[in-house]
Structures are given as structure tokens and as C-alpha cells.
Amino acid sequence: MSFGDIVVQARQRIGLSQKHLASQLRKEDGSPISAQYLHDIEKGRRNPPPPPLLDQLAQALNLPPDYLYYAAGELPQDLREAGLGPEQVHKVFGALRDELKSGHKT
């Protein structure tokens, strides 16, 4: 499932229109994102948004932030700031792969 598909499903699950959700999300300058920008994200025409918008999306959609970061191919800020070395990152992702292969959902 793509990042856009996740956003669409979560948005529809809680009954929000694109316009309403977009009005809740703020760019760095404090202005709301456009419904067109959100539409493009949902359709995969734009890359997933930057971390500050991922956090806002997670809150607005009642999703765990880590789930959206994972779907967007991003590391959450606390992990980026932790200064993990290559071996630690490899170990964490290896554990996740092992968990997925064993059929368990994390």
C-alpha cells in the first residue's frame, strides 16, 4: 500500500474531505496546505510531505506517527537525532525484517 493510499483510507475512515484535512495542515509559514497538494500526495504525484507535516497528518488522521514515517520512508526525528551509526540502523531494520518474515505484525 502506498503512502497516498494510507492517507486516503485514514481520511475516509474518519469522514474528512480533502479540503477539510488540508485546512488542518500547516506549512512552515503557518498557512494551510492546499487541497490540490493533498490530492497530489494521495495520488502519488508528490513525494510524501516533510516530517513536520507527517506529524500533523498523523495527529489529524489518528494514526501513530511512526506508521506514517515508515510509509513515507522517513526516520522519526527522535531516531534521526539519536545519532545511530550504520551498524545500529542495520540491526534495527534487520530486526524489523525478521519480525515481518515471521508473520508477526509490529
What spans do the regions from the language model cover?
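Short alpha-helical "recognition helix" segments of helix-turn-helix
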Residues: 21-27, 57
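A short, Lys/Arg-rich alpha-helix, primarily the initiator
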Residues: 1-16, 23
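DNA major-groove recognition helix of helix-turn-helix
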Residues: 25, 42, 53, 72
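Interfacial/linker helices and their anchor residues that mediate assembly or domain coupling
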Residues: 72-106
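Recognition helix of helix-turn-helix/homeodomain-like DNA-binding domains
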Residues: 26-48
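DNA major-groove recognition helix of helix-turn-helix/homeodomain DNA-binding modules
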Residues: 43, 49-67
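Conserved hydrophobic/aromatic packing and binding residues within compact polymer-binding modules
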Residues: 7, 18-22, 36-41, 68
